[in-house]
Regions:
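Conserved G/P- and acidic residue-centered "switch" motifs that form tight phosphate/ATP-binding loops
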Residues: 79
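Short, surface-exposed ligand- or partner-binding patches at beta-edge/loop junctions that are enriched
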Residues: 74-75
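Rhodanese-like catalytic fold shared by cysteine-dependent sulfurtransferases
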Residues: 1-20, 27-71, 82-130
């Protein structure tokens, strides 16, 4: 698995227009916190069950990607959920998986707030919300 910070991910996506960009956060995060334009929403788990099913996730990504050879870029809130999700895709046979380090909102600062240290939005990259 490759690990790219948000700005490097933006460059990667422009250089790999065929890459599947997946937001694996819960639907409420995706819709109301915001997301990059064009990202495909495939949750790693969903409320209220909160059950991780790596086989289901890999099958959904494979269906959306049209196979396992297309590069897959994974985004979550802070870059933590993408690690086990990326490992699941690699175990399922995906050839190129990219983890967006720091995710969409970034790491917590000293006051337990996100979006002040790093992350997709912090870096000023394109995003939208409902």
């Amino acid at each position: 698995m490759k690990h790219l910070e948000p700005r490097a991910t933006w460059v990667y996506l422009r250089e790999h227009p065929n890459a599947l960009f997946v937001d694996l956060r819960m639907e409420i995060e995706h819709l109301y916190v915001g997301h990059p334009p064009g990202v495909v929403h495939i949750p790693w788990y969903e409320y209220p069950e909160m059950q991780v099913d790596p086989a289901r996730f890999a099958a959904q990504v494979e269906r959306e990607a049209g196979g396992k050879t297309r590069p897959v870029v994974l985004l979550c809130r802070s870059g933590r959920r993408t690690l086990p999700a990326g490992a699941a895709l690699e175990a399922a046979g995906f050839g190129e998986v990219v983890n967006v380090v720091h995710g969409f909102e970034g790491e917590l600062d000293a006051h337990f707030r996100r979006g002040r240290l790093n992350g997709w939005r912090f870096d000023g990259l394109p995003w939208e919300q409902m």
